[in-house]
Amino acid sequence: MTTYAIIDIAGKQLWVEPKRYYSVNKINVEIGKKIALQRILLLSKIGEKIKIGQPFLNGISINAIILRHFLAPKVIVYKMQPKKKTRRKRGHRQHLTSFLINDF
């Protein structure tokens, strides 16, 4: 069993572990800045009982550092209507932020 938590960040719920890298939808924070994640849904540490928030845990924060902002690989959307000569091709690249979980 390892130490892990489930957090709510940028509209997504993530299972996170210490000393690991994660990417989520863009967060408007400068690169290199440390942030405290306080929207924790569940926390499990080795040798302790699992803590479940309702909906969030109070008084607990997870420290993280912003590493970079980048674009995800391009997704191509191609729409076509048969027998109509109607074709539409669009591309989209999502803005993402990568961060490192330091400690709980």
UniProtKB/Swiss-Prot annotation:
Cystine residue pairs: none
UniProt keywords, alphabetically: Cyanelle, Plastid, Ribonucleoprotein, Ribosomal protein, RNA-binding, rRNA-binding
Superkingdom of the source species: Eukaryota
Main location: plastid
GO biological process: translation
Pfam families associated with the record: Ribosomal_L21p
GO annotations of cellular component type: cyanelle; mitochondrial large ribosomal subunit
InterPro entries found in the cross-reference section: bL21-like (IPR028909), bL21-like_sf (IPR036164), Ribosomal_bL21 (IPR001787), Ribosomal_bL21_CS (IPR018258)
Cell location: Plastid, Cyanelle
GO MF term set: rRNA binding; structural constituent of ribosome
Purpose: This protein binds to 23S rRNA.
Subunit relationships: Part of the 50S ribosomal subunit.
Recorded family membership: Belongs to the bacterial ribosomal protein bL21 family.
This protein's name: Large ribosomal subunit protein bL21c
The species this protein was found in: Cyanophora paradoxa
Highest classification ranks of the organism: Eukaryota, Glaucocystophyceae, Cyanophoraceae, Cyanophora
Name of the coding gene: rpl21
